């Protein structure tokens, strides 16, 4: 197979996934934007977390809110729970990898904050544990998933499920949805 043909196939797959994602996530997206705006207006914060590529998305989206997305404005309170290697490794060593995010939510989360777990499968144990702790503490426990939503269904609300079984396509939609989230939160919570 020629490389260009392969690239064309990847772009076509992306376009197919893009075509069905909007309708699938529209309603929970609106609720998530509102939850984030309400939390920030009340002095709360948004906590992002995930593993691997989803950890990178968590960092990326938190940075967009703290620094800027489209324009210079006041900083918005957001944090990626994927960046503190001392905390992550101490927790994994002393407790378990399953608790690396939930311990941070226990320490940093407050009722009314928004916790956003990102996992393409919807079933990453440490993300699920963190969402359960967040929900029990009175945070909005939201999620980005793919496939059929996995074990996040019934736990995360709002839950934005990308209707694809291909990890790369799910990740591409997650960052698109995340950018749209940052755009709308920035526009409402910190208008120019």
Curated annotation (Swiss-Prot):
EC number per UniProt: 5.3.1.28
Binding positions for substrate per the UniProt entry: 51-53, 64, 93-94, 119-121, 124, 171
Catalytic reactions on record: 2 D-sedoheptulose 7-phosphate = D-glycero-alpha-D-manno-heptose 7-phosphate + D-glycero-beta-D-manno-heptose 7-phosphate
Localization: Cytoplasm
Pfam families for the chain: SIS_2
A cellular component annotation (GO) from this entry: cytoplasm
Names of the cofactor(s): Zn(2+)
Listed SUPFAM superfamilies: SIS domain (SSF53697)
Residue ranges constituting the SIS domain according to the UniProt record: 36-192
GO terms classed as biological process: carbohydrate metabolic process; D-glycero-D-manno-heptose 7-phosphate biosynthetic process
Keywords, sorted A to Z: Carbohydrate metabolism, Cytoplasm, Isomerase, Metal-binding, Zinc
MF (Gene Ontology): carbohydrate derivative binding; D-sedoheptulose 7-phosphate isomerase activity; zinc ion binding
Positions that bind Zn(2+): 60, 64, 171, 179
Function, as annotated: Catalyzes the isomerization of sedoheptulose 7-phosphate in D-glycero-D-manno-heptose 7-phosphate.
UniProt miscellaneous comment: The reaction produces a racemic mixture of D-glycero-alpha-D-manno-heptose 7-phosphate and D-glycero-beta-D-manno-heptose 7-phosphate.
Protein family (similarity comment): Belongs to the SIS family. GmhA subfamily.
Subunit and interaction comment: Homotetramer.
Name of the protein this chain belongs to: Phosphoheptose isomerase
Natural source organism: Paramagnetospirillum magneticum (strain ATCC 700264 / AMB-1)
Gene: gmhA
């Amino acid at each position: 197979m020629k490389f260009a043909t392969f690239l064309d196939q990847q772009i076509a797959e992306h376009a197919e996934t893009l075509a069905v994602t909007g309708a699938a996530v529209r309603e929970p997206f609106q609720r998530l934007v509102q939850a984030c705006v309400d939390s920030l207006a009340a002095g709360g914060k948004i906590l992002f977390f995930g593993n691997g590529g989803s950890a990178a998305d968590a960092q990326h989206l938190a940075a967009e809110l703290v620094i800027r997305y489209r324009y210079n404005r006041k900083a918005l309170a957001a944090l990626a729970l994927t960046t503190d290697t001392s905390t992550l490794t101490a927790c994994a060593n002393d407790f378990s990898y399953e608790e690396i995010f939930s311990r941070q939510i226990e320490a940093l989360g407050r009722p009314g904050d928004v916790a956003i777990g990102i996992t393409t499968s919807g079933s990453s144990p440490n993300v699920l544990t963190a969402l359960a702790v967040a929900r029990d503490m009175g945070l909005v426990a939201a999620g980005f998933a793919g496939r059929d939503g996995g074990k996040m269904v019934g736990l995360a609300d709002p839950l934005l499920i990308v209707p694809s079984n291909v990890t790369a396509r799910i990740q591409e939609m997650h960052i698109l949805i995340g950018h749209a989230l940052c755009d709308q939160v920035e526009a409402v919570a910190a208008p120019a």
